């Protein structure tokens, strides 16, 4: 489930609520999903979102939530697991996100171990060689010797450049934390971190791993590998081996066996005939030792110089590993200036029985297995001191050929004749050496092999005790008693398979462990080994499943006999829990790919490969997230190979048959088994026992019962899910029906609207047609009118006068002449012309008659059209009411249906309202008696007189050890805070109840009050005063200023509330031990008074107490959470068992160092709280919680935010001092000038003036004494350290007459003042305060004389009303005057009696 940034903000970064919501949504139980994975998903998402989110750019809330999560117990395992998974699977996508996440881890203080816990002298003497004269005495304590190897390992790792991430992270850790880290790396297969931490890189040229077979030619092994074996416990052996083998392919060949560890045993046996030549060579070599020593001395001097240079370069406090006990005598590794910081010391190894001088180097194991060491160079003194520890620890003899230095124990003679030989000349030394060599060789030739074996085993038994419980001890022990490397691998991997009484080891089936070596060297092994489950070797090991699969497949690749495959399958049948295991699809794919790469398998078993590939593709497509069963995989392979599985036969009989001596097959590795130490009697005992007992049947029954239980659980879950789904489906159907019912009337309305729109469109079309017709009629009428006009014109022409007629006749005659001329041109006959003339009037009459007829027809058409329109209108009028009726009927039906639905909904609502009314009626009494309602649902709790609800919305706070605080009611009347605590922590509960009862009886106004106590089987419930919010809530939500304004108090008065509460605790010998802003609560007057008045019958009170103590002022602070407090009887020291962790940064050094705690612990916490209050949420040791503890340990304080208020700085700086003896008592805190009232400040000014007068009188001069001069100079307090010193800067940068209104305030005064002297300023302030009434009277007279008084006079007149306003005026003009006088007069507090009350 992916979480959005908005969801995280909604839950206010409460990851537990998010996790619960996740489980509910997915129907998961707590065992099926991990809370840690939910948190890590949220944190990674926030790392990606917050840097780009403008709304939440600060990310302070995220950082606080992150480190709260980091402080939980599973942090390191989770981070390493997530880092390994993300980097191996999706490195390209998620590396950037996790880099941001891991960068925060590097700065974390969760595993902080103080560097000062280690003995700094030991560190400097052993690991930081600042000069060659740092000697370690031979009589060191045993404790220093025991921790040498551990510190040697961790320092050699921390100095590694390639592991900078982890080395910075674990800079201040101890050796045990490093082992824990390595265990987690092994557990979660975090190979990347392992490479960085232990320098396992192929590409590194400087620190390249050199691991080769332990043969006679090359005996080199990496120190890093053996160091891993040193710090690895047996339980985590298999993951360690996977990491080692992945990075060192030849590691299996270099595992020490008896032949490789005790040396040169077989070499000497093979070369018995050449002993004389060896002795001669040895003598020659010994004769040349003197020459070699001279050269080596020069080299060693250079080496010492280089060591000094390296130490000077690395003098920043980092522990550097200057040397490592491995080396190679090559010229390129001379100790020149360019050589690395690792100074390798070449040495030779000598066995007391077999003298060997031809070897030039030795591996790490032979160094510890040899009984003596001789160096062919001069040994550095500091290096020799460390080797001396090895000699003491393991009993080795060490010798150097150097002339300058020789170890007191002579190497050449094991008896008592060694000391004298060391003092002889070089020739004598050579002779003695030759004699000793000859004696040793003779002894070697004369000793029997059996005695050699016994001595060798005795020496190895000594080494088994080195780092007991680690893999290196197992290597030593198994190499001493067995001959085969398979035993060591078996032990390293923890594969002591089955019960050793009747089951054999798989490793004994193969010669020299070839098959398992092949599978471990496979390039796919790293994925197959990644099993998330982990169990110790004594339990069933699910991590063996991939090994068994590959071992079985390797049999095929090596073309082994199928009988061996039967043995593997029988082993799985005997260990059925392993057989029923599963592998992931990725592992299955790796198996298929591995088989494809094997040519022999591809040739012989192609059908099996195709089937496996088909199964893999099928599973990958359909169910890629589901694992694949092991038994199915083995069954498929086995059927194709025709290797039967013994299901119904006796398993042990088949195994016994395999071990019989008669079974001989030259091609089978079983032929060598008779030579091995196989106990056949144990196998036969197992056979008889299995025949007599029904052990397998019992196992089958148990498995069947488990299956039935799991099936039942699954069925129950299915039924529950089905019920939930049915309910959801029903709800969905009801919602759909409702929507449909609402949609039907809407659809009808839409349909009606469509019909109306269509009718409107038709009407519009008809209107348009009518308009067109009307236009046509108008055109016709116009034409008729024109014709009529023409006719009228003709008639008028006929009626014209004779003149006009004559004119017309003349015109006509002209026309006729023209016509005649035309006729002539056309050659027309005269009769034709006459006919034309006669036809003209007839044509005219015909035209007129035709026009009349057309006009009549048009009129008739218009009449018909009008009649049709009338008829249509009538029809429409008749149809409209019918349509309206239909629509109205439809609307009525819809309204009826809607009303029915509304009535149904109303009924449902009424039922809900009735239920709610019933609830309200049932809780009316609670409503009337209390300020809030408790809903009686599933989470409702009623215990004794307490009633509350366990819903999360009703939780007021959470504490340690599962403590919860609920909002509830006591006696059905009084609202209280109910604190639920587990009975498993009875000491704390009794302690808190005892403290609360005593405080309640004493009636403290600034402490939370105890009301009542109830308990049940599991919990104890305490009723406490119900408060509003905490100081932390006010600050974080920006409501502190609002609270101060509404309280009617100043900031100093509110701070005094907290101090009064602490004073009350200390006066009754109670140390709170856990003061922080969360435990400072707010309480209003009304609420407190009501609660106190109603609970008087239950609470015991003192009859002699004052009435004022029962009433709190408006919005005061009170102290709560006394779960960690301690009632003191004999002294003021607190020895609580449940010590605070100090993670919030409100505990001093002594708490972090688990020392005894006194009242000064509360003083330190109170100082941090006062700084928090005065600066609105800041911390004196930094706001970043990562570095608070670090800054507290180093006393890095920053009070610059209070630079304007030097009194507060002075008080807080003394309260948070690193030295508890320098912190003030609570009475001294209350007596500090920061909390003085006006009267006490005026008294202090009078006392200062008296001292100035006495100093003048004693000095004999006119104010020239040292004290009065010192008043003029500034006294500076350092805001970041404890060092305070006076400076030569003047207290005032200008004369004080320019700072105050001297003219108006000195009216009527005849005194003279020096404005550059502070003593005169004190005298002026004192005179103004004493004579302020006279000064005010004179100023008022001036105002009366002036017609318009100035603003300055009015202001001064207002100031002189009382002493408070006057002192406030001077403090505003000269802010730090009281602080300056307080610090200057502190030296004289013991000399003058009237000053004692101001400083005690």
UniProtKB/Swiss-Prot annotation:
Basic and acidic residues composition-biased segments: 863-882
Coiled coil spans: 689-801, 842-933
Positions annotated as active site in the UniProt record: 1074 (proton acceptor)
Catalytic activity: L-seryl-[protein] + ATP = O-phospho-L-seryl-[protein] + ADP + H(+); L-threonyl-[protein] + ATP = O-phospho-L-threonyl-[protein] + ADP + H(+)
Signal peptide positions (record): none
CDD domains hit by this protein: RNase_Ire1_like
Protein's UniProt name: Probable serine/threonine-protein kinase irlF
Protein's gene: irlF-1
